[in-house]
C-alpha cells in the first residue's frame, strides 16, 4: 500500500516538473504575463513579502513559515489518510496466507482461462474482506500543494527581491545542491520510518518506490531555485513527524484490525474452475437424422438403371 503512495508522489512530482518547465509567458523585454503569473506568481510574491516582514525581511524564514502553515493545515488530512493506509496494511497482512496460496495457484496455471479465473478469485478475496486496492491513499494533499509549488517557484523566479535573497549564505534564486541533498535525505528518512514494524516481505516490495520518490525530489530541487528546495526540506521534516505519529498509533490500529477479524473472520472465496475451451464446441449427443427418403429414391434409380 505504501508503494502506491510512493507512486502517487512520484507521478505528482513528475507533473510538477512538467508544470514548472514553462507555464509563464514573457514579452520580448522579458516581462512575465499570463494566467499562471497573474493568479499564482503575483499573489505568491505578495504573500512572501508579507511573511518576510514578519521575520525581519528574511525570505528564507518566510519560506519556512509558509511551509509550516501549509503543512499544519494539511496535517489532519494527511494523518487521516496515512492512518487509513496503515489500517489497510494490517488487513492485507491478515489475509496474506490466503493471498499467497491463490498467487501460487496463479503461477502454476497453464492457460489464460485458469489465470483469469484465479485473478478474479484474488479480487473476490479483497472485496469480501474490505481491502481497498488503493490502500486508502489519496492524492488530494499533493494536488492542493501543486499550486503552492508553482506560486513559490514563479514568485522566486520573477521577483527581484526574492531572486536576490539569501538564507544562511545560500542564494534562494539559484539552485542549491546542499538544500537538494537535505530534501532528498529528509524524504529518504521518512521512507525508512514508514517501514518500521512492517513484515520483511512487505518491506521488499516498498523499497523501490520509497527510493524513487526522494530521487525525484532530488532532481526537482536541483533544477529549481533553492527556495523550492528549502520548501521540500522542511516539508520532508513534517512528513517524518507524520510518520512518527502513525508509528505511535500502529499498535492501536493493529488491535482494531484484530478485533474486527474476531467479529468478522477472513472470508476465503471458493476456488473457481475455468470452463474448458471446447465446451461449446462439443459434439451433440444425438446423431444427426439421415435423409432415408432421399436414400430410397436413389436406390430406386439405381435399380432401374441395372434393369
From Swiss-Prot:
GO cellular component, one term: plasma membrane
Lipidation (N-palmitoyl cysteine): 23
Membrane topology reported for the UniProt record: Multi-pass membrane protein
Gene Ontology terms, MF aspect: membrane insertase activity
Residues where lipid is bound covalently (S-diacylglycerol cysteine): 23
Transmembrane segments: 59-79, 136-156, 177-197, 205-225, 226-246
Subcellular localization(s) per the UniProt record: Cell membrane
One GO BP annotation of this record: protein transport
Cleavable signal peptide: 1-22
Chain positions covered by the region annotation Disordered: 260-307
Domain of life: Bacteria
Family that this chain belongs to: Belongs to the OXA1/ALB3/YidC family. Type 2 subfamily.
NCBIfam families: yidC_oxa1_cterm
HAMAP family: YidC_type2
Function in brief: Required for the insertion and/or proper folding and/or complex formation of integral membrane proteins into the membrane. Involved in integration of membrane proteins that insert both dependently and independently of the Sec translocase complex, as well as at least some lipoproteins.
Protein name: Membrane protein insertase YidC 1
Amino acid at each position: 500500500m505504501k508503494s502506491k503512495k510512493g507512486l502517487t508522489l512520484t507521478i505528482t512530482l513528475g507533473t510538477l516538473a512538467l508544470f514548472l518547465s514553462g507555464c509563464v509567458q514573457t514579452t520580448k523585454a522579458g516581462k512575465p504575463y499570463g494566467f499562471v503569473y497573474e493568479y499564482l506568481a503575483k499573489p505568491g510574491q505578495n504573500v512572501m513579502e508579507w511573511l518576510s516582514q514578519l521575520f525581519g525581511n528574511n525570505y528564507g524564514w518566510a519560506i519556512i513559515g509558509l511551509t509550516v502553515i501549509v503543512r499544519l493545515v494539511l496535517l489532519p488530512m494527511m494523518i487521516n489518510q496515512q492512518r487509513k493506509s496503515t489500517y489497510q496494511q494490517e488487513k492485507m497482512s491478515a489475509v496474506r496466507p490466503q493471498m499467497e496460496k491463490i498467487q501460487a495457484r496463479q503461477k502454476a496455471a497453464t492457460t489464460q482461462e485458469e489465470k483469469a479465473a484465479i485473478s478474479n478469485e484474488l479480487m473476490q478475496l479483497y472485496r469480501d474482506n474490505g481491502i481497498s486496492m488503493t490502500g486508502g491513499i489519496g492524492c488530494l494533499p499533493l494536488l492542493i500543494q501543486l499550486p503552492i509549488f508553482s506560486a513559490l517557484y514563479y514568485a522566486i523566479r520573477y521577483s527581484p527581491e526574492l531572486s536576490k535573497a539569501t538564507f544562511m549564505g545560500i542564494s534562494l534564486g539559484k539552485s542549491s545542491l546542499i538544500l537538494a541533498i537535505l530534501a532528498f535525505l529528509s524524504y529518504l528518512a521518512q521512507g525508512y520510518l514508514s517501514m518500521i514494524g512492517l513484515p520483511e516481505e512487505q518491506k521488499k516490495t516498498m523499497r523501490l518506490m520509497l527510493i524513487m520518490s526522494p530521487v525525484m525530489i532530488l532532481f526537482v530541487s536541483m533544477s529549481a531555485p533553492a527556495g523550492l528546495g528549502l520548501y521540500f526540506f522542511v516539508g520532508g521534516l513534517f512528513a517524518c513527524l507524520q510518520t512518527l505519529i502513525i508509528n505511535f498509533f500502529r499498535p492501536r490500529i493493529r488491535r482494531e484490525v484484530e478485533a474486527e477479524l474476531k467479529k468478522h473472520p477472513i472470508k476465503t472465496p471458493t476456488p473457481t474452475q475455468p470452463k474448458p475451451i471446447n465446451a461449446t464446441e462439443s459434439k451433440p449427443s444425438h446423431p444427426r437424422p439421415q435423409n432415408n427418403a432421399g436414400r430410397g429414391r436413389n436406390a430406386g434409380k439405381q435399380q432401374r438403371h441395372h434393369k
